[in-house]
C-alpha cells in the first residue's frame, strides 16, 4: 500500500540532504525544504545558482590554503599586510573568523591536516616573506599542543618566535562557537608557545 510519504520522494530527499548540514536537525531540515519548495521557490533557485557558482569557483589559495576564488587569495596578494607574522590556523573558516576581528594584519597558513603540510613550501615562504613570528591560533587541546610542538621542532632552525593565542578559548570548542570579544581578547593576549 502506498503511503503519503512514499509519494513525496523528491521532497523527502531534499529534507535528507538538508539534514546532513552540520547543526541542522530533522525539524529544521523539514522547515527549510518546505519553505524552499513551496513558499519561496525563487529563493531555492537563487540558492541553487549560488551553490553552482561557489562549487565552480571556490578553491584554496596556493600560498596559504585559505579559501579563494583565484590562485592566490586577497590576503596573500595584499602588499600592505605585515610579512613578519604568520598565523597558523586549522581550517579555512578560521581565517574568516579571525579576519572579522580585525586584530591581525599579517599573513595566514591553513594547516587542514598535518599530513598535508608541505614543509618545503612553508620553509620557502618563511624565507621569502621574512617571517619572524609564527602565531598558533588553535583551539586549546592536547592534540593541538602536540601539533604546535611538532611544528616548532620542524622549523626550529629558522630561529622564529613561536606564540599561541592565550587561554580564554574554552578547551574543545571550535572558533565558530566562541563570541568575538572572547576570541579577540584571547588573540591579543597570545603567549609564547
Curated annotation (Swiss-Prot):
GO biological process: double-strand break repair; recombinational repair
SUPFAM superfamilies xrefs: Recombination protein RecR
Matches recorded under Pfam families: RecR_HhH, RecR_ZnF
Entry annotated with the keyword Zinc-finger: yes
Zinc finger (C4-type) in chain: 61-76
A GO molecular-function descriptor: zinc ion binding
InterPro entries: DNA_Rcmb_RecR (IPR000093), Rcmb_RecR (IPR023627), Rcmb_RecR_Znf (IPR015967), TOPRIM_dom (IPR006171), TOPRIM_RecR (IPR034137)
Keywords: DNA damage, DNA recombination, DNA repair, Metal-binding, Zinc, Zinc-finger
PROSITE patterns for the chain: RECR, TOPRIM
Superkingdom, natural source: Bacteria
Residue span, Toprim domain: 84-170
Family: Belongs to the RecR family.
HAMAP family linked to this entry: RecR (MF_00017)
Function: May play a role in DNA repair. It seems to be involved in an RecBC-independent recombinational process of DNA repair. It may act with RecF and RecO.
The protein, known as: Recombination protein RecR
Organism: Helicobacter pylori (strain ATCC 700392 / 26695)
Gene symbol of the encoding locus: recR
